[in-house]
């Protein structure tokens, strides 16, 4: 099988799996228990907290472990809003966010919060000017993704955070697609909170983390909770967190090399698209917006993305038509709508995403599949033209 859907999830690496197995066998104590088994688990937990904090340039006291990106987003947003004055009940997010953010926004509206969903500019970027038109005195929190999971477009978070802080507004950033893929420093970005996920970086599923600056006030979603310093209820998954940390340390150690590999693979793929005259165009204008090199969101014109994905699957190649969390929905994604794509264009969208095990040979197989599909389609066009020509002659 050729797997080219790393933006959806990744296979667990051997290092993380080894740590998970060892901790499951040797450090099975509840980290909240006062006996030695609990103390050993607590020591591992705090060690992992320190390591994850170091990776993002944060403080260990600001790291809270969760069950993954979706829960990280929800708990971060809700906890920050809970900590704000009652006069700050206006929440802003963008049309291009992960579905978990949209779901959270809908839930906030049910609680009586005022929610504004802003559109990016034509290049998929949120600008200071766009924020300016929507910020109000009661705006308390803004949530903007670091990079889009479908297009790879990276938002200018550092610039936006400075602007928001000057207005006294907190900024949460969903960094699930960028953590471990590009350098992240919370101080440089200027974010107040950051969401991360394990299974996007070759760690186990069911684990994630939130970083909240220690000086930022928040109040828990779950009342009377003691786990994770009151941030999240339930017995802490120490083996999963240990494996997540092992995966994070490994991927960060390989980051520079992997970025170069991804850039080379991306260049090769796009060059071959042009050489073969395939009707494939990028969803993002890379001359106007910086993009993650391992994500190629594109349109295969004359084909529905779902059809291309299924044909690739028949050839034992895994690609995507967008976010896996919205895979059951057959229609234009919110990101495509935000980029002003027509419904026809949006339905032609496919996503190819690279990872640690991706090779040029695998991309060659994908290109071959694309070429076969296009040759078949051109043959159909020729038949249609002949039929129409014969019809005109008979008339």
Swiss-Prot record:
Cofactor annotation: pyridoxal 5'-phosphate
Q: What is this protein called?
A: Putative cysteine desulfurase NifS
Q: What induces it?
A: Repressed in the presence of nicotinic acid.
Summarize the protein's role: Catalyzes the removal of elemental sulfur from cysteine to produce alanine. Seems to be required for NAD biosynthesis.
Catalytic residues? 325
A Pfam family matched in the record:
Aminotran_5
* Record organism: Bacillus subtilis (strain 168)
Q: What happens when the gene is disrupted?
A: Cells lacking this gene require nicotinic acid for growth.
Annotated EC: 2.8.1.7
- One GO MF term, please? cysteine desulfurase activity
InterPro entries, per database record: Aminotrans_V_dom, Aminotrans_V_PyrdxlP_BS, Cysteine_dSase, PyrdxlP-dep_Trfase, PyrdxlP-dep_Trfase_major, PyrdxlP-dep_Trfase_small
Entry-linked SUPFAM superfamilies: PLP-dependent transferases (SSF53383)
**Record's keyword annotation contains Lyase:** no
Family the UniProt entry places it in: Belongs to the class-V pyridoxal-phosphate-dependent aminotransferase family. NifS/IscS subfamily.
Instruction: Write out the entry's keywords from A to Z.
Output: Iron, Iron-sulfur, Metal-binding, Pyridoxal phosphate, Transferase
Q: Which residues are recorded as binding pyridoxal 5'-phosphate?
A: 69-70, 177, 197-199, 235
């Amino acid at each position: 099988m050729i797997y080219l859907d790393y933006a959806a999830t990744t296979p667990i690496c051997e290092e993380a799996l080894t740590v998970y197995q060892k901790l499951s066998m040797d450090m099975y104590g509840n980290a909240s228990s006062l006996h030695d088994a609990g103390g050993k688990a607590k020591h591992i937990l705090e060690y992992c907290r320190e390591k994850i904090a170091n990776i993002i340039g944060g403080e260990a006291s600001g790291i809270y472990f969760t069950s993954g990106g979706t829960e990280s987003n929800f708990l971060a947003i809700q906890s920050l809003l809970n900590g704000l004055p009652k006069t700050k009940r206006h929440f802003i997010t963008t049309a291009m966010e992960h579905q978990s953010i949209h779901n959270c926004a809908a839930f906030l509206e049910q609680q009586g919060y005022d929610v504004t969903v802003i559109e990016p500019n034509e290049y998929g970027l949120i600008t200071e000017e766009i924020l300016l038109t929507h910020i109000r005195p009661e705006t308390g929190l803004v949530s903007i993704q670091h990079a889009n999971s479908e297009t790879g477009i990276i938002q200018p978070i550092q610039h936006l955070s400075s602007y928001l802080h000057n207005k006294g507004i907190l900024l949460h950033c969903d960094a699930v697609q960028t953590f471990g893929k590009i350098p992240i420093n919370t101080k440089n970005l200027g974010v107040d909170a950051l969401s991360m996920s394990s299974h996007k970086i070759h760690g186990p599923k069911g684990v994630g983390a939130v970083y909240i600056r220690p000086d930022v006030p928040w109040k828990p979603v779950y009342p009377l909770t003691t786990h994770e310093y009151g941030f999240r209820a339930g017995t802490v998954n120490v083996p999963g967190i240990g494996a997540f940390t092992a995966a994070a340390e490994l991927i960060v150690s390989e980051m520079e090399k992997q970025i170069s590999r991804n850039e080379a693979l991306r260049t090769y793929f796009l060059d071959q698209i042009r050489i073969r005259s395939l009707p494939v165009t990028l969803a993002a204008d890379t001359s106007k917006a910086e993009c993650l090199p391992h994500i190629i969101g594109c349109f295969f014109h004359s084909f529905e993305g779902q059809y291309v994905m299924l044909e690739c699957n028949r050839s034992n190649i895994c690609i995507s038509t967008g976010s896996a969390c919205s895979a059951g929905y057959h229609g234009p994604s919110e990101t495509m709508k935000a980029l002003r794509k027509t419904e026809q264009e949006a339905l032609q969208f496919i996503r190819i995403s690279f990872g640690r095990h991706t090779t040029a040979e695998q991309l060659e197989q994908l290109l071959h599949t694309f070429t076969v599909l296009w040759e078949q389609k051109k043959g159909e066009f020729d038949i249609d033209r002949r039929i129409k020509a014969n019809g005109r002659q008979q008339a």
